[in-house]
């Protein structure tokens, strides 16, 4: 199992980064918030989880071991695969997600892409006693301007000018106030690609 990757960032995309370590380029899937902390050409270190399937071996990267452990805990729930678990961590940071599960906040959990009411209830039922809750974190609004910073940072990390990134992000959030970080980033990239 590959537990961590450290090396030069070769490429950053919407959903993954390529990090060269010991002459090998590793494609690591990650959340937009994690990707926003990386810079092309700079050295990076990600804690990883390697998921082996019949037809693929995929690395998922996280800023810290707490996020990775929460990801692996989510995978223990029936019906939750790596893409949904990563989507949950893209929607909410670790303490907020733990709080939502601990409080049984099904409404907040259904905001996660591909998670319906039954899956959200199963998450709460299965994980309520397994995840610690943070008393200081409330469930933040999934959309709105709380995602502006990570989207702008991700765009700048992809090589866009700060002003361009801010303008595109503001336009996207004005049109789609309930957008998630990943959908806002996609829309902003689409908008910037048309210029």
From Swiss-Prot:
Name a Pfam family for this protein.
Answer: RuvA_N
- Renumbered residue ranges of the record's region Domain I: 1-63
Q: Which GO terms describe its molecular function?
A: ATP binding; four-way junction DNA binding; four-way junction helicase activity
Give its localization.
Answer: Cytoplasm
- What GO terms describe the biological role, i.e. biological process, of this protein? DNA recombination; DNA repair
Keywords, comma-separated and alphabetical: Cytoplasm, DNA damage, DNA recombination, DNA repair, DNA-binding
Q: What are the coiled-coil residue ranges?
A: none
Start and end residues of each stretch annotated as Domain III: 143-195
How are the domains described in the entry?
A: Has three domains with a flexible linker between the domains II and III and assumes an 'L' shape. Domain III is highly mobile and contacts RuvB.
Main function: The RuvA-RuvB-RuvC complex processes Holliday junction (HJ) DNA during genetic recombination and DNA repair, while the RuvA-RuvB complex plays an important role in the rescue of blocked DNA replication forks via replication fork reversal (RFR). RuvA specifically binds to HJ cruciform DNA, conferring on it an open structure. The RuvB hexamer acts as an ATP-dependent pump, pulling dsDNA into and through the RuvAB complex. HJ branch migration allows RuvC to scan DNA until it finds its consensus sequence, where it cleaves and resolves the cruciform DNA.
Q: Quaternary structure per UniProt?
A: Homotetramer. Forms an RuvA(8)-RuvB(12)-Holliday junction (HJ) complex. HJ DNA is sandwiched between 2 RuvA tetramers; dsDNA enters through RuvA and exits via RuvB. An RuvB hexamer assembles on each DNA strand where it exits the tetramer. Each RuvB hexamer is contacted by two RuvA subunits (via domain III) on 2 adjacent RuvB subunits; this complex drives branch migration. In the full resolvosome a probable DNA-RuvA(4)-RuvB(12)-RuvC(2) complex forms which resolves the HJ.
The protein's name is: Holliday junction branch migration complex subunit RuvA
């Amino acid at each position: 199992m590959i537990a961590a990757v450290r090396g030069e960032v070769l490429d950053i995309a919407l959903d993954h980064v390529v990090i060269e370590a010991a002459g090998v380029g590793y494609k690591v899937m990650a959340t937009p918030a994690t990707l926003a902390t990386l810079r092309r050409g700079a050295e990076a270190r990600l804690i990883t989880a390697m998921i082996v399937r019949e037809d693929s071996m995929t690395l998922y990267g996280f800023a810290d071991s707490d996020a990775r452990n929460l990801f692996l805990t989510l995978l223990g729930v029936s019906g939750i695969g790596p893409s949904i678990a990563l989507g949950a961590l893209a929607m909410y940071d670790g303490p907020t997600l733990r709080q939502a599960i601990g409080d049984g906040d099904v409404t907040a959990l259904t905001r996660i892409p591909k998670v319906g009411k039954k899956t959200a209830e199963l998450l709460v039922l299965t994980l309520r006693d397994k995840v610690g809750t943070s008393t200081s974190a409330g469930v933040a609004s999934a959309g709105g301007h709380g995602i502006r910073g990570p989207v702008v940072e991700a765009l700048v990390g992809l090589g866009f000018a700060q002003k361009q990134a801010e303008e595109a992000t503001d336009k996207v959030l004005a049109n789609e106030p309930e957008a998630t970080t990943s959908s806002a980033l996609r829309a902003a990239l689409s908008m910037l690609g048309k210029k």
